[in-house]
């Protein structure tokens, strides 16, 4: 398949769509599928963390956030907010989820 190497992007994109719609469990599952397919997709792990918080899986979100911070120690909530051009309400929920999971704010 010519686009097989891009499937992680599709999975994470589907996760983002579910996150935008407030379907956090589905968002976490799809985004995690993308991360599993391409572990270097740190941006996908941001969705996994925030979606897990909003789905009520805070312990899992904290574990994933710690793992993400080991891979990307300079990541903060404010860095994540500046990285994407999503709607303000999406970004607010993302930032809230990341902060709740223990990501530094600045």
Where are these regions (language model features)?
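Alpha-helical protein-protein interaction modules
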Residues: 1-106
């Amino acid at each position: 398949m010519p686009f097989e190497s891009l499937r992680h992007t599709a999975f994470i994109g589907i996760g983002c769509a579910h996150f935008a719609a407030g379907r956090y469990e589905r968002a976490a599952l799809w985004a995690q599928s993308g991360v599993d397919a391409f572990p270097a997709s740190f941006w996908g792990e941001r969705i996994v963390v925030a979606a897990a918080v909003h789905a009520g899986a805070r312990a899992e979100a904290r574990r994933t956030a710690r793992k993400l911070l080991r891979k990307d120690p300079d990541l903060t909530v404010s860095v994540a907010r500046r990285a994407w051009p999503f709607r303000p309400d999406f970004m607010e929920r993302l930032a809230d989820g990341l902060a709740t999971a223990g990501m530094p704010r600045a």
